[in-house]
Amino acid sequence: MKHAPEPAHRHGGAERCAILLVNLGTPDEPSAPALRRYLAEFLSDPRVVEIPRAVWLPILHGVVLRVRPAKSAAKYASIWTAEGSPLKVWTEKQAKLLTGYLGERGHPVLVRAAMRYGQPSVATQLDALKADGATRILVLPLYPQYAAATTASVFDAVYAWAARTRRVPELRFVNHYHDDPGYILALGRCIEDHWMRNGRAERLVLSFHGVPERTLRLGDPYHCECQKTARLLTERLALKPEQVLVTFQSRFGKAKWLEPYTEPTLVQLAQQGIRRVDVACPGFTSDCLETLEEIAQEAREAYLHAGGETFHYIPCLNDRHEWIAALSDIAIRHLQGWPTQTAPDPAALQAQALRARQLGAQA
C-alpha cells in the first residue's frame, strides 16, 4: 500500500490534542441521486450487512439502489431544515459546544465532527486535525451503546485512514458509555423536562435502533447495553419496571431483528387501552431520520390509527447542556495522561527549532 506524502517535518511546532466526534452520517441533500450515493456507501459496509459480498452486492446494486433512494429521499425531505440535515446540524453544534465547554474547563483541545458515511468523512476530518497540529486524537463515536455495525465500523474507518498515513498520530478510542452517570442524568433531565411541560403518559417507550438478532448470539453486547441503559434510566426517573417498555426500531430486510419491534408494540398498547404514550430514543444522541420521521411521524400515526389518543415523541439530547457536560466528562477521562492543559511555550519551541537546525535539520 502506498502511503500518502506528508509535509516536511518541522521542528519546534506546537503539538495539540484533539477529539473526533463521529456520527452515522447523512446524504448531502434529500434527493434520489444523493440518497443513492449515501446508501451505496452505507449498505456496502460489511459491518452493516453481514452477508457474503458475492451474494449481497448484486442485490444492493441491482435491486435496493434502484428502488430505495427515491423512497428514502421523500422521507428525508419531510425532516430537512433550512440548515440542512438535522443529524449533521446537531452533531456539528455538539462539536462546537464541546470545544467551548472543554476550553472553559482548561482543556483547549481541537474538536471536529465527522460522518461515518457521507461528508465530512472520517478521513477528511482526521487530515484536517493533523493539518491543525494534532498529534494525539481521541475518537469518540456518538453511539452510547457498542455495536459492531456502528462503533466498530467507525474504528474500521480510522484504521483504514491510518493504514494510508505515513505519520500516524497517537490514537485512542471510546468504546461505549451506555452506563455513564452523566449520560443517564442527561437522558433523565430531558424526559423530566418534557413531563414538566406536557404531563406524564401511561407508558414510556424507550426505542433503540435494532440490529439482527443473530448478532447477539455472535457476541455483540449491544442488546445488553441497551437494556442496562433502560434500567438505569428507569431507576433515575423513579418509575416502576412495568411503566417502561424497551423496543427496537428500523428493521431492514427479512431476517429476525431484536424484539419487540417499536411500531407493533405501540399498536398493541393502543389496542390494550393505553391512551397516552411517551416515546424516547436513548441510543440516538442527535435527532435524525430515525427519530423525526420513523418515530415522530410513522409510529405516531400507527399508534393513533390503532386507537391511541396522545402520542408524544421526546427529542434527543441534541445540544442540551447536561449532554455536553457528560460528553466533556467522558472525553476528559479518556484524555488522561495527554497534555491537554499545557499551553505551548513559544520560546521553548523556538529554541527547539534552533537546536534542530544547528544539527542539520532543514525545517
Swiss-Prot record:
Reaction catalysis annotation: heme b + 2 H(+) = protoporphyrin IX + Fe(2+)
Signal peptide segment: none
EC number: 4.98.1.1
PROSITE patterns the UniProt entry points to: FERROCHELATASE
Subcellular location: Cytoplasm
Binding-site residues, Fe cation: H209, E290
GO molecular function: ferrochelatase activity; metal ion binding
Gene3D superfamilies named among the record's database cross-references: 3.40.50.1400
UniProt-listed SUPFAM superfamilies: Chelatase
Organism annotation: Methylibium petroleiphilum (strain ATCC BAA-1232 / LMG 22953 / PM1)
Matches recorded under PANTHER family: FERROCHELATASE, FERROCHELATASE, MITOCHONDRIAL
Annotated family: Belongs to the ferrochelatase family.
Gene name, Swiss-Prot/TrEMBL: hemH
Pfam families: Ferrochelatase (PF00762)
Keywords: Cytoplasm, Heme biosynthesis, Iron, Lyase, Metal-binding, Porphyrin biosynthesis
GO cellular component: cytoplasm
Chief location: cytoplasm
Gene Ontology process terms (BP): heme biosynthetic process
Pathway assignment: Porphyrin-containing compound metabolism; protoheme biosynthesis; protoheme from protoporphyrin-IX: step 1/1
Name of protein: Ferrochelatase
Job of this protein: Catalyzes the ferrous insertion into protoporphyrin IX.
